[in-house]
């Protein structure tokens, strides 16, 4: 998508910054998104889970803890400049902003990595992003 529509600036032009953004996209896809799937569907990953509510709760809690640890690592590895993509919002910013909305991540990073939480809030505050997010996550 970034190569087909370079004017959209989905990824940075600088090769080093571009590689870092791609690394960030892969990090979220490989480390965060799978944890959300386990939290949402633990029965797909634990064969004996059945209707055992206590076990389901433990699987979800342990997986959520791992997910939040992964977001802490992400925050430490991918600093904003002022956005994750660099000077303007790009693919990594949007992906991080969306995936971090699930499984209690925002509350966790607000406490554990407030600077990263501020980046996510900056991304969400962009009028283009805010309009889309309002459709999927209406203000409370």
Regions found by a protein language model. Name each.
Residues 7, 76-87, 128-133:
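Surface-exposed helix-capping loop/turn segments at secondary-structure junctions
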Residues 59-78:
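Amphipathic alpha-helical packing segments from all-alpha helical-bundle domains
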Residues 62-66, 112-125, 129:
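Extended, well-ordered alpha-helical scaffold segments
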Residues 21, 74, 93, 123-129:
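Residue-level signal for nonpolar/aromatic packing positions in well-ordered secondary structure
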Residues 57-64, 83, 106-109:
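Active-site rim elements
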Residues 1-58:
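GST-like domain detector, emphasizing the conserved glutathione-binding G-site
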Residues 31, 36-40, 84-109, 122-123:
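GST superfamily/GST-like fold recognition
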